[in-house]
Each structure stands twice: as C-alpha cells, then as structure tokens.
Swiss-Prot record:
The lineage of its organism: Eukaryota, Fungi, Dikarya, Ascomycota, Saccharomycotina. It is found in: Cytoplasm. Pfam families: Ribosomal_S21e. Required for the processing of the 20S rRNA-precursor to mature 18S rRNA in a late step of the maturation of 40S ribosomal subunits. Has a physiological role leading to 18S rRNA stability. GO terms for molecular function: structural constituent of ribosome. PANTHER family: 40S RIBOSOMAL PROTEIN S21 (PTHR10442). Keywords: Cytoplasm, Ribonucleoprotein, Ribosomal protein, rRNA processing. The keyword Ribonucleoprotein applies. This is Small ribosomal subunit protein eS21. PROSITE patterns: RIBOSOMAL_S21E (PS00996).
Amino acid sequence: MENDKGQLVELYVPRKCSATNRIIKAKDHASVQISIAKVDEDGRAIAGENITYALSGYVRGRGEADDSLNRLAQQDGLLKNVWSYSR
C-alpha cells in the first residue's frame, strides 16, 4: 500500500524462497535470509554489493538448504568446482 506521496507504508513485505519461489509467510520462523558479500582481489568486501538468498522453513525442514544454496550459488557464478549429480 502507498500513501499520497507514493511511499511504501506496509509493515510486512512478503519475501519469496529463492529455492522454491514459494512466498515466505509472516509466521515462518524457521526461514532465513543469507547475504553473501562480493569481494575484490584482496579479499575485502565491496561495500553495497552482495547477493541475498531467502530460504523458507519448508526447505530447511526437509534438509535441502545446503543443496539449494549450492545450486543457487552455482547459478550466480559464485561456486565453480562443486560436485553435482546432474553433471
């Protein structure tokens, strides 16, 4: 919802699970949001540049969070030499 100035005024903005594209509900207390910083050649974090993944409690409860995070990071080019059964 927006006010007359066009500013967002809602208290809750729903997120989607990065692995399943399901909406993460407000009462899903098992969900996590993980931010991975991009780094320069010296290994220092670049300010303001990061990649964020949201994982729902459903994915974490099934024990698929680590595989999902590896798959998402491979798609974004963060991991290159991780074993995958699909290769």
